[in-house]
């Protein structure tokens, strides 16, 4: 499994950054390669994205969600990955968004993309675009404030 950890500081309150991140269907607006995210249920997402030039589809479950703190997920099929995004108040109106990903590169193209740092750079660029997206708006496009308790069997 490959691991990526990146963070970005955004000039919005924790609540605003967190609320925007719960709007999964907006991800294509700032995540390169993400074509579509559909929220099937409160805890299930259907993704369609281009990875290393190949279009892929998969479902992922939200395994834990605590408002203004964290959102964790794990893929169910397709590219094997899991991750967590956490939100940290630095000062009034400034939030650190930290993203941690673990993923299993599949074919040779994905392994090369991982080895060359392409995937890490894409994550950095996505976080930068998230910053531009939320700071230019100044407010979230929506919010889901529900909680998902971590399943102790995972």
Where are these regions (language model features)?
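Short, hydrophobic/aromatic-rich segments at coil-to-beta transitions
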Residues: 39-46, 65-73
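Beta-strand/loop substructures that line and gate deep hydrophobic ligand-binding cavities in soluble
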Residues: 63-64, 72-132, 136, 141-143, ...
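Short acidic, glycine-rich loop/turn motifs
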Residues: 49-53, 75-77
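Hydrophobic ligand-binding cavity/cleft-lining segments
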Residues: 1-44, 129-138, 149-154
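Intrinsic-disorder/low-complexity, polar/charged segments enriched in Ser/Thr/Lys/Arg/Asp/Glu/Gln
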Residues: 3-7, 44, 57, 70, ...
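Short, cysteine-centered beta-strand-loop-beta hairpins and adjacent loop/turn segments enriched
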Residues: 52-59, 105-109
